[in-house]
Amino acid sequence: VEDGIQWTNGDAKKLMTEAPFQWIDLDPFGSPVSFLDSAIQSISRIGVLEVTATDTAALCGSAKTSAARRYGSTGITDAYMHDDATRILLGVIARIAAMHDKAMYPILSLFDGHHVRVSVLLKRSKEVASNWNEHIGYRIRSEPYHFASQPSGEFSGPMWTGPLFDANIAGRMTIERAIELCAGRVVDYPEDWSELDIKHSQREIERSVRHISESAELLSG
Protein backbone atom coordinates (compact mmCIF):
# COMPACT_ATOMS: atom_id res chain seq x y z
CA VAL A 1 0.00 0.00 0.00
CA GLU A 2 1.37 3.40 -1.03
CA ASP A 3 -0.41 6.70 -0.30
CA GLY A 4 -3.58 4.78 0.47
CA ILE A 5 -3.45 2.89 -2.83
CA GLN A 6 -2.99 -0.87 -2.99
CA TRP A 7 -0.95 -1.97 -6.01
CA THR A 8 -1.46 -5.51 -7.29
CA ASN A 9 -0.03 -7.29 -10.32
CA GLY A 10 -1.98 -10.32 -11.46
CA ASP A 11 -4.69 -11.77 -13.67
CA ALA A 12 -7.19 -8.92 -14.14
CA LYS A 13 -10.20 -11.22 -14.51
CA LYS A 14 -9.37 -13.02 -11.26
CA LEU A 15 -8.57 -9.84 -9.34
CA MET A 16 -11.81 -8.16 -10.36
CA THR A 17 -13.88 -11.00 -8.90
CA GLU A 18 -12.18 -10.92 -5.50
CA ALA A 19 -14.02 -7.84 -4.23
CA PRO A 20 -16.77 -5.43 -5.28
CA PHE A 21 -15.54 -2.21 -6.86
CA GLN A 22 -17.19 1.17 -7.31
CA TRP A 23 -14.90 2.17 -10.18
CA ILE A 24 -13.16 0.01 -12.76
CA ASP A 25 -11.10 1.28 -15.71
CA LEU A 26 -10.48 -1.30 -18.45
CA ASP A 27 -7.69 -0.29 -20.82
CA PRO A 28 -6.33 -3.45 -22.46
CA PHE A 29 -4.37 -3.71 -25.67
CA GLY A 30 -6.92 -4.38 -28.40
CA SER A 31 -10.46 -5.46 -27.60
CA PRO A 32 -11.85 -5.21 -24.04
CA VAL A 33 -14.59 -7.79 -24.70
CA SER A 34 -12.93 -10.66 -22.81
CA PHE A 35 -12.75 -8.53 -19.65
CA LEU A 36 -16.26 -7.06 -19.69
CA ASP A 37 -18.10 -9.90 -17.99
CA SER A 38 -15.72 -10.00 -15.00
CA ALA A 39 -15.65 -6.22 -14.72
CA ILE A 40 -19.43 -5.79 -14.82
CA GLN A 41 -19.95 -8.56 -12.25
CA SER A 42 -17.42 -6.85 -9.97
CA ILE A 43 -19.08 -3.43 -10.02
CA SER A 44 -21.04 -2.69 -6.83
CA ARG A 45 -24.79 -2.02 -6.88
CA ILE A 46 -23.91 1.40 -8.26
CA GLY A 47 -20.54 2.02 -9.88
CA VAL A 48 -18.62 3.45 -12.81
CA LEU A 49 -17.05 1.37 -15.57
CA GLU A 50 -14.64 2.96 -18.02
CA VAL A 51 -13.66 1.02 -21.13
CA THR A 52 -11.09 1.63 -23.85
CA ALA A 53 -11.00 -0.30 -27.13
CA THR A 54 -8.14 0.00 -29.61
CA ASP A 55 -9.35 -2.60 -32.11
CA THR A 56 -10.87 0.15 -34.23
CA ALA A 57 -10.55 -1.83 -37.47
CA ALA A 58 -13.23 -4.17 -36.13
CA LEU A 59 -15.39 -1.43 -34.63
CA CYS A 60 -15.20 0.84 -37.69
CA GLY A 61 -16.14 -1.80 -40.23
CA SER A 62 -12.89 -2.59 -42.03
CA ALA A 63 -12.38 -5.93 -40.22
CA LYS A 64 -15.86 -7.39 -40.51
CA THR A 65 -14.99 -10.93 -39.40
CA SER A 66 -13.43 -9.64 -36.18
CA ALA A 67 -16.40 -7.34 -35.61
CA ALA A 68 -18.87 -10.19 -35.97
CA ARG A 69 -16.84 -12.50 -33.74
CA ARG A 70 -16.07 -10.03 -30.93
CA TYR A 71 -19.03 -7.68 -30.96
CA GLY A 72 -21.74 -9.53 -32.87
CA SER A 73 -22.05 -6.46 -35.04
CA THR A 74 -21.07 -5.00 -38.38
CA GLY A 75 -19.81 -1.54 -39.29
CA ILE A 76 -19.42 0.47 -42.47
CA THR A 77 -16.37 2.58 -43.26
CA ASP A 78 -17.94 5.94 -43.99
CA ALA A 79 -18.47 9.32 -42.31
CA TYR A 80 -20.46 7.67 -39.51
CA MET A 81 -17.93 4.96 -38.66
CA HIS A 82 -16.49 6.65 -35.54
CA ASP A 83 -19.94 7.21 -34.08
CA ASP A 84 -20.87 3.64 -35.02
CA ALA A 85 -17.74 2.31 -33.29
CA THR A 86 -18.62 4.10 -30.07
CA ARG A 87 -22.22 2.91 -30.17
CA ILE A 88 -21.29 -0.70 -31.00
CA LEU A 89 -19.06 -0.83 -27.91
CA LEU A 90 -21.79 0.71 -25.73
CA GLY A 91 -24.29 -1.81 -27.07
CA VAL A 92 -22.11 -4.74 -26.03
CA ILE A 93 -21.62 -3.26 -22.56
CA ALA A 94 -25.38 -2.72 -22.19
CA ARG A 95 -26.12 -6.32 -23.21
CA ILE A 96 -23.59 -7.88 -20.81
CA ALA A 97 -24.71 -5.56 -18.00
CA ALA A 98 -28.31 -6.68 -18.50
CA MET A 99 -27.22 -10.30 -18.16
CA HIS A 100 -26.16 -9.39 -14.61
CA ASP A 101 -29.32 -7.40 -13.81
CA LYS A 102 -27.59 -4.07 -14.26
CA ALA A 103 -28.69 -1.04 -16.25
CA MET A 104 -26.16 1.05 -18.19
CA TYR A 105 -26.19 4.85 -18.38
CA PRO A 106 -23.51 6.51 -20.56
CA ILE A 107 -21.58 9.33 -18.87
CA LEU A 108 -19.02 10.22 -21.55
CA SER A 109 -18.16 8.66 -24.91
CA LEU A 110 -15.52 9.54 -27.47
CA PHE A 111 -13.50 8.35 -30.43
CA ASP A 112 -10.02 9.84 -30.38
CA GLY A 113 -7.32 8.93 -32.87
CA HIS A 114 -6.99 5.16 -32.65
CA HIS A 115 -9.23 4.27 -29.74
CA VAL A 116 -12.79 4.36 -28.44
CA ARG A 117 -13.28 5.44 -24.83
CA VAL A 118 -16.54 5.23 -22.90
CA SER A 119 -17.50 5.88 -19.28
CA VAL A 120 -20.78 4.42 -18.05
CA LEU A 121 -22.71 4.27 -14.80
CA LEU A 122 -23.98 0.82 -13.88
CA LYS A 123 -26.93 0.39 -11.51
CA ARG A 124 -28.43 -2.86 -10.30
CA SER A 125 -32.04 -2.87 -11.47
CA LYS A 126 -33.77 -5.92 -12.89
CA GLU A 127 -36.65 -3.78 -14.12
CA VAL A 128 -34.52 -1.34 -16.13
CA ALA A 129 -32.08 -4.04 -17.26
CA SER A 130 -34.99 -6.04 -18.69
CA ASN A 131 -35.59 -3.21 -21.15
CA TRP A 132 -31.96 -2.82 -22.22
CA ASN A 133 -32.77 -3.49 -25.88
CA GLU A 134 -35.05 -0.44 -26.11
CA HIS A 135 -31.89 1.49 -26.98
CA ILE A 136 -30.44 -1.14 -29.32
CA GLY A 137 -30.90 -0.85 -33.07
CA TYR A 138 -29.32 -0.27 -36.45
CA ARG A 139 -28.18 2.76 -38.42
CA ILE A 140 -29.94 2.56 -41.78
CA ARG A 141 -27.99 3.99 -44.75
CA SER A 142 -30.91 5.46 -46.67
CA GLU A 143 -31.72 9.17 -46.80
CA PRO A 144 -32.25 10.50 -44.29
CA TYR A 145 -29.90 8.21 -42.32
CA HIS A 146 -31.71 7.03 -39.20
CA PHE A 147 -31.85 4.46 -36.43
CA ALA A 148 -34.30 1.56 -36.64
CA SER A 149 -35.11 -1.43 -34.45
CA GLN A 150 -34.68 -3.84 -37.38
CA PRO A 151 -32.05 -3.89 -40.16
CA SER A 152 -32.97 -3.12 -43.75
CA GLY A 153 -31.04 -2.23 -46.89
CA GLU A 154 -27.50 -1.07 -46.10
CA PHE A 155 -27.00 -0.86 -42.34
CA SER A 156 -24.54 -1.01 -39.45
CA GLY A 157 -25.20 -2.50 -36.04
CA PRO A 158 -26.65 -3.66 -33.80
CA MET A 159 -25.54 -0.75 -31.65
CA TRP A 160 -26.57 1.56 -28.82
CA THR A 161 -29.01 4.17 -30.14
CA GLY A 162 -29.50 6.07 -26.89
CA PRO A 163 -27.60 9.07 -25.47
CA LEU A 164 -23.79 9.10 -25.54
CA PHE A 165 -23.34 11.61 -22.70
CA ASP A 166 -24.84 12.59 -19.38
CA ALA A 167 -25.82 16.21 -20.08
CA ASN A 168 -25.41 17.32 -16.48
CA ILE A 169 -21.84 16.02 -16.25
CA ALA A 170 -20.74 16.94 -19.77
CA GLY A 171 -22.20 20.43 -19.41
CA ARG A 172 -19.80 21.13 -16.55
CA MET A 173 -16.72 20.04 -18.49
CA THR A 174 -15.56 23.50 -19.51
CA ILE A 175 -11.98 24.38 -20.41
CA GLU A 176 -11.71 26.54 -17.30
CA ARG A 177 -12.87 23.72 -15.02
CA ALA A 178 -10.56 21.21 -16.70
CA ILE A 179 -7.55 23.50 -16.20
CA GLU A 180 -8.53 24.04 -12.57
CA LEU A 181 -8.78 20.31 -11.88
CA CYS A 182 -6.00 18.90 -14.05
CA ALA A 183 -3.27 21.48 -14.57
CA GLY A 184 -1.84 21.00 -11.08
CA ARG A 185 0.35 23.41 -9.16
CA VAL A 186 3.49 24.99 -10.54
CA VAL A 187 5.51 23.44 -7.69
CA ASP A 188 4.46 19.98 -8.90
CA TYR A 189 5.80 20.42 -12.44
CA PRO A 190 9.12 18.72 -13.32
CA GLU A 191 12.05 20.96 -12.52
CA ASP A 192 13.28 20.94 -16.12
CA TRP A 193 9.96 22.17 -17.55
CA SER A 194 10.08 25.50 -19.32
CA GLU A 195 7.22 27.96 -19.75
CA LEU A 196 6.66 26.38 -23.17
CA ASP A 197 6.25 22.93 -21.60
CA ILE A 198 3.67 24.25 -19.15
CA LYS A 199 1.70 25.97 -21.91
CA HIS A 200 1.82 22.83 -24.06
CA SER A 201 0.47 20.76 -21.16
CA GLN A 202 -2.41 23.19 -20.66
CA ARG A 203 -3.21 23.20 -24.37
CA GLU A 204 -3.49 19.41 -24.30
CA ILE A 205 -5.93 19.67 -21.39
CA GLU A 206 -7.95 22.26 -23.30
CA ARG A 207 -7.98 20.07 -26.42
CA SER A 208 -9.28 17.09 -24.46
CA VAL A 209 -12.50 18.86 -23.40
CA ARG A 210 -13.02 21.43 -26.15
CA HIS A 211 -16.65 21.58 -27.35
CA ILE A 212 -17.88 18.96 -24.85
CA SER A 213 -19.88 21.35 -22.66
CA GLU A 214 -21.37 23.10 -25.71
CA SER A 215 -22.42 19.76 -27.22
CA ALA A 216 -23.77 18.23 -24.01
CA GLU A 217 -27.47 18.67 -24.77
CA LEU A 218 -27.13 17.41 -28.35
CA LEU A 219 -25.14 14.30 -27.42
CA SER A 220 -27.40 13.39 -24.52
CA GLY A 221 -30.56 13.55 -26.62
Model-derived segments and their meaning:
Residues 1-221:
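SAM-dependent transferase fold signal centered on methyltransferase-like domains
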